[in-house]
């Protein structure tokens, strides 16, 4: 029987090697590790190689891990067409164009959290009644345009504001003119039914947010720009970031247009009413501060009343997808594009911008607390601006180092625990456990693993097997489990002290397409064991105020409830 179980579980758990992706816990690691230094050097060489191949003359790159800038570099000259030009630096300004939408989305969530707008699903005309547009749809709710629809490109609006770009910010493209033109136009689709990228939508979103402030408490001439400057730029120390080109004209690196090897500098157009969709000028250094903020790494140092403080739930919304695109491997969020990286089995969240010789991309790998901002100051066809290739270099290295750091932590904890423990009884067992696939410190469990090992069945043919502990890799010291042929690993429940009969199991043999539907890379369930004492009495841990005194030697596992089924040992 044991031989049969061994062969069965050997086959079942072989697919742990080809399982749903799991991600190590981001912790501080030595940035001078040779593997990291090589990775950063490889990224440096990658950028230089790509620049040469694509004819890019100036470029900036910033990479953040957790709360630190770990790589930053400027390439080329401030102005390639000026033979006397100084080198480009991390503090020179450039246009980030549609990356501006990140700030507009941040503003939306903050005003919602502050109660300035009641709900993301409010009709924007409740706040901006001057906005009108025609609709072929008859039902009242089909004519609504909400904050959420604008932020996720599902509003049904056209892509562009009804003005020529060269007229932005002039007397030919004022708010009055724009609203008058829109009032004679129609929605191109029913809101929420179609993903259709819209610069107009984000400009309207920012202006509606400004109107909500004007209604409630602010009387500034331009409440959108004023609010973003004073509630995002200034608190984050983004002192060289602005909507006003005149403020930084002498510090701005011009964008270049490459026309078959002939380079020219397009004239700098204003944004005017369209600023919320693409009007920000920033620097590589300032964008590094934004990366740290959006990774949630500076919240602990901020007062909860700070204008730049972000609730964890708000950050989760900001980074959540809203609607799947037709290709099935990408989706729009508010505002990030979510793209699945098959190379690394994870989602990359990004927002790019492309305007007048500037092509920028901000990207996040949330499970690893990595953020990147790359900007080409020359027109280039790469919409991700080489960030995806850089991520392909970074992830294997960070994964290896973080996994090793986790194992080292366990070994150190085990050594410390062994040195400090003078006696060992049969009522406690030292186990190394994982919650959400990240290593945690040693835990002294009330229920030893040996008590759980065995075969559980019921009259419906369900079979639940628990074998012994693993001794390798990510699954170190966890129990191997099989339920109806599916491979699992058993972890401790977070409240194991109070509820020692509850355990967490993780499924590991799912296909990659299935894995894509699972947030954070793991598919977990909770299971509930029932124990009897030597007299056949069921132990009720919930009603035992002193379950520390339960004699493990006289306990027997009676049953387990897993995914709605009750199985008996």
UniProtKB/Swiss-Prot annotation:
Membrane-crossing ranges are none
Presence of the UniProt keyword Glycoprotein in the record: yes
| Secretion signal, residue range per the UniProt entry | 1-19
Q: Which GO terms describe its cellular component?
A: extracellular region
Would I find Membrane among this entry's keywords? no
- Glycosylated sites: 87, 172, 239-240, 250, 299, 343, 412, 419, 436, 468, 509, 535
| Cell compartment(s), UniProt | Secreted
| UniProt keywords, alphabetically | Glycoprotein, Secreted, Signal
InterPro entries the record matches? Beta-lactam-related, Beta-lactam/transpept-like, Beta-lactamase-like_AB/R
Location, primary (coarse class):
secreted
Similarity section: Belongs to the beta-lactamase family.
Q: Please state what the protein is called.
A: Beta-lactamase-like protein 4
Q: Which organism is it from?
A: Dictyostelium discoideum
């Amino acid at each position: 029987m044991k031989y049969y179980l061994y062969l069965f579980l050997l086959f079942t758990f072989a697919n742990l090697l080809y399982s749903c992706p799991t991600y190590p816990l981001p912790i501080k690691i030595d940035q001078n590790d040779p593997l990291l230094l090589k990775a950063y050097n490889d990224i440096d060489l990658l950028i230089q190689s790509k620049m040469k191949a694509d004819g890019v003359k100036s470029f900036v790159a910033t990479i953040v891990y957790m709360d630190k800038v770990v790589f930053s570099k400027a390439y080329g000259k401030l102005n390639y067409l000026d033979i006397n030009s100084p080198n480009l630096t991390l503090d020179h300004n450039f246009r980030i164009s549609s990356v501006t939408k990140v700030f507009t989305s941040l503003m939306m969530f903050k005003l919602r959290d502050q109660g300035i707008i009641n709900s993301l699903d409010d009709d924007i005309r409740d706040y901006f009644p001057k906005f009108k547009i025609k609709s072929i749809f008859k039902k009242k709710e089909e004519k609504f345009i909400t904050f959420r629809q604008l932020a996720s490109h599902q509003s049904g609006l056209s892509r562009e504001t009804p003005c020529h770009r060269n007229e932005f910010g002039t007397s030919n493209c004022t708010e009055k003119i724009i609203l008058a033109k829109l009032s004679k136009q129609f929605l191109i689709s029913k809101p929420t039914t179609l993903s259709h990228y819209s610069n107009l939508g984000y400009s309207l979103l920012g202006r509606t947010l400004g109107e909500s402030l004007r209604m409630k408490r602010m009387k500034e001439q331009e409440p959108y720009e004023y609010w973003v400057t004073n509630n995002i730029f200034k608190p984050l120390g983004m002192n060289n970031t602005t909507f006003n080109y005149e403020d930084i004209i002498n510090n701005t690196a011009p964008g270049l247009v490459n026309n078959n090897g002939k380079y020219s500098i397009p004239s700098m157009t204003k944004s005017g009413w369209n600023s919320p969709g693409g009007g920000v000028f920033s620097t590589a250094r300032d964008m590094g501060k934004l990366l740290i903020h959006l990774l949630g790494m500076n919240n602990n140092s901020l007062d909860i009343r700070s204008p730049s403080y972000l609730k964890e739930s708000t950050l989760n919304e900001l980074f959540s997808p809203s609607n799947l695109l037709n290709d099935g491997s990408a989706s729009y969020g508010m505002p990030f594009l979510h793209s699945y990286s098959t190379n690394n089995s994870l989602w990359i969240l990004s927002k790019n911008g492309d305007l007048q010789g500037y092509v920028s991309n901000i990207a996040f790998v949330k499970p690893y607390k990595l953020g990147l901002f790359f900007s080409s100051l020359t027109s280039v066809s790469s919409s991700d601006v080489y960030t995806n290739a850089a991520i392909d270099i970074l992830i294997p290295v960070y994964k290896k180092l973080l996994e090793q750091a986790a194992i080292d932590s366990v070994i150190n904890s085990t050594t410390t625990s062994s040195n400090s423990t003078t006696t060992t009884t049969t009522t406690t067992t030292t186990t190394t456990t994982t919650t959400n696939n990240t290593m945690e410190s040693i835990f002294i469990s009330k229920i030893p693993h040996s008590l759980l090992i065995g075969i559980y069945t019921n009259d419906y043919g369900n079979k639940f097997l628990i074998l012994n502990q693993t001794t390798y890799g990510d699954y170190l010291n966890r129990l191997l489990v099989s339920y109806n042929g599916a491979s699992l690993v058993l972890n401790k429940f977070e409240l194991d002290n109070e509820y020692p009969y509850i355990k967490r199991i993780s499924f590991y043999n799912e296909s990659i397409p299935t894995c894509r539907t699972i947030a954070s890379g793991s598919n977990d369930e909770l299971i509930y064991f029932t124990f009897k004492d030597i007299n056949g009495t069921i132990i009720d841990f919930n009603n035992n105020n002193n379950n520390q005194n339960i004699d493990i030697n006289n306990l027997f596992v009676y049953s387990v409830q897993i995914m709605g089924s009750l199985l008996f040992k």
